[in-house]
Amino acid sequence: QDAVAAEASVFWAQDGLKCKARPDWFTRTCSYDLKISVHASKDIGTLRYRAWAEGWMHQGAHVRAGLRANGFPDVAKHRLVVIAPKGPSSVQTYCLELSEHTLDVIELEMESIRKAMVPCVETGIWPGTPDDWETIEIPESALTADLDEEEVAGE
């Protein structure tokens, strides 16, 4: 499985929408996505759930659809390499593979989502989207969290 491309954008039209994906890496049979996640330091059950809840599985199905539409019909699987943001990363790394069947099921769900999006794209009306932007700041606890860790380490 020789690598075909790293971080190459693919574009295609599907279900009446213009689509784009940017796999981190892909071969002729598999796409890959590198994730940095605090969930990599937890058990596999938690990580499996997070892969679903965070949309990583859906992203894999989307990438596969794009690669297939761009002349790579044999791309069947999607692999996630999930690494914890804090060391030791070599101990906290998971390599997860989404089966072709899993991606097929998710693709069916995404097809209905895309079809529901077409009227929104055509009219410019997106239900539930606010008209005003909410300005947010970095939480104070996040600003002091690293300082607290440094104080503990220095003691």
Predicted regions and their residues:
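Short, surface-exposed loop/helix-turn segments at secondary-structure junctions
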Residues: 44-50
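Metal-dependent nuclease catalytic regions and adjoining charged, substrate-binding loops involved
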Residues: 52, 57, 62-155
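Catalytic cores of nuclease domains that cleave nucleic-acid phosphodiester backbones
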Residues: 1-44
